[in-house]
From Swiss-Prot:
Gene name for this UniProt entry: WFDC6
SUPFAM superfamilies: BPTI-like, Elafin-like
InterPro entries referenced in this protein's UniProt entry, alphabetically: Elafin-like_sf (IPR036645), Kunitz_BPTI (IPR002223), Kunitz_BPTI_sf (IPR036880), Serpin_venom_toxin (IPR051388), WAP_dom (IPR008197)
rRNA processing as UniProt keyword: no
Pfam families: Kunitz_BPTI, WAP
A molecular function (GO) term: serine-type endopeptidase inhibitor activity
GO (cellular component) term, any one: extracellular region
Protein location: Secreted
Organism: Homo sapiens (Human)
Protein name: WAP four-disulfide core domain protein 6
N-terminal signal peptide: 1-25
Amino acid sequence: MGLSGLLPILVPFILLGDIQEPGHAEGILGKPCPKIKVECEVEEIDQCTKPRDCPENMKCCPFSRGKKCLDFRKIYAVCHRRLAPAWPPYHTGGTIKKTKICSEFIYGGSQGNNNNFQTEAICLVTCKKYH
């Protein structure tokens, strides 16, 4: 079997591999992931590794220092800094959703939401992108 015989077999694999690259899939599957570069102190646990890991209307995107399921119908604008490790996880953070400034608050919980960041500086960089 020469090169011409192998080509029809290889073309579908080449095309599928190209579509699965993040840059190509984003254009096909809807809105692209936010392109916000931030320097984080601690690696975060990924919520997802591929789009099917996320609930309907959400997309698996690199966000802050891990991969998160993001809902593009919402604006991500809440920040936090970790106060205590592990259990119970109490966080301090702020919101700019209404006032468009970061204000501190303390909350506890095991998972929180996608609107959280390790420092106020990271929050401000991220939130500035959306306002």
